[in-house]
Structure formats: C-alpha cells, structure tokens
Amino acid sequence: MALEKSLALLPLLVLVLLVLGWVQPSLGKESRAKKFQRQHMDSDGSPSSNPTYCNDMMKRRNMTQGRCKPVNTFVHEPLVDVQDVCFQENVTCKNGQANCYKSSSSMHITDCRLTNGSRYPNCAYRTSQKERHIIVACEGNPYVPVHFDASVEDST
C-alpha cells in the first residue's frame, strides 16, 4: 500500500525536479542591465564633495569583493535619461563593437579610480566629480545600457 502511494507520487517528484533544474540556474543570476545599474547608476546620490564617496559606494555596490575594481563611474542622472542614450549618437565602442551610444548632453558623473599602492582588501579610491558626455553599450529587448564604455568632454 505504501509502495503504491510512493509510486503514484514519483511522476510528480520527477516533474518538480525537472522544473527546478530548469529554473534554478537563472535564480540569483544578475542580468547585464541590472549589473550596469548596480555598478553605474546613483540617481539618488547628488554629486557632492564627499572625498569618501567612491570608497563607500564601491564597497556598498560589491565592487571590492575578491579584488579592487580599478576604475568605475557613477552616473547621477535619472535612469530613464541614461536609458535614452541608447537611442542617441551611435559611436564605436573601445573594443570595436558597434553598439555604443554617446549622450547628446553632458551628465553629472563621479569618476572613481584606485589610488596608487592600494591593494585588496583595503581598496582606496580617488573621487572626482565631473560633467561629461557618457558612452554606453546597449543591447537586449528592451534596448538598454549594459556597459559603461567611457566619458568624454564637451567638444564645443
């Protein structure tokens, strides 16, 4: 009797395991768009003269785990404005790809650079506030930023 009940539940167990095996790899995997937002967007943070901004943000955004990320840029503009860059001037990316776009207007950014002699786990960054055009790589559907390629000064 117990064996019959166990055998009746076997197909259900197999189905559950198959679904878990299919869904599980995507659980916890950050999309490229979400990674871009985590690493580069700080819409709420207004640029300030806080000299520890980069040290704090790089740690808070998990970019000092296992190593010190040498360079990072935070953009202090609304996410929708940064996403709109994907439909502005098409430029060639540093790696030669053709999916980069340059913002039509300058944006408030913070440039974070690892200081000389700084080593993991004591990552120390130099914080620089700038107003620059940004260049981002875009992909997907919807077409959104997935990589911060560069920032450039106004060419006027």
From Swiss-Prot:
Binding residue positions for substrate: K35, R38, K69, P70, V71, N72, T73, K94, R113
GO biological process: defense response to Gram-positive bacterium
Subcellular location(s) per record: Secreted
Keywords: Disulfide bond, Endonuclease, Glycoprotein, Hydrolase, Lyase, Nuclease, Secreted, Signal
One Pfam family per UniProt: RnaseA
Gene3D superfamilies documented for this protein: Ribonuclease A-like domain
UniProt GO cellular component terms: extracellular region
Reaction(s) this enzyme catalyzes, per UniProt: an [RNA] containing cytidine + H2O = an [RNA]-3'-cytidine-3'-phosphate + a 5'-hydroxy-ribonucleotide-3'-[RNA]; an [RNA] containing uridine + H2O = an [RNA]-3'-uridine-3'-phosphate + a 5'-hydroxy-ribonucleotide-3'-[RNA]
Xref: SUPFAM superfamilies: RNase A-like
Stretch forming the signal peptide: 1-28
Composition bias type Basic and acidic residues, residue spans: 33-43
E.C. numbers: 4.6.1.18
Gene Ontology molecular function: any one: nucleic acid binding
Disulphide bond pairs: C54-C112, C68-C123, C86-C138, C93-C100
PANTHER family: RIBONUCLEASE, RIBONUCLEASE PANCREATIC
Quaternary structure and interacting proteins, as annotated: Monomer. Interacts with and forms tight 1:1 complexes with RNH1. Dimerization of two such complexes may occur. Interaction with RNH1 inhibits this protein.
Family indicated by similarity: Belongs to the pancreatic ribonuclease family.
Role of this protein: Endonuclease that catalyzes the cleavage of RNA on the 3' side of pyrimidine nucleotides. Acts on single-stranded and double-stranded RNA.
Name the UniProt record assigns to this protein: Ribonuclease pancreatic
UniProt organism field: Ateles geoffroyi
Underlying gene: RNASE1
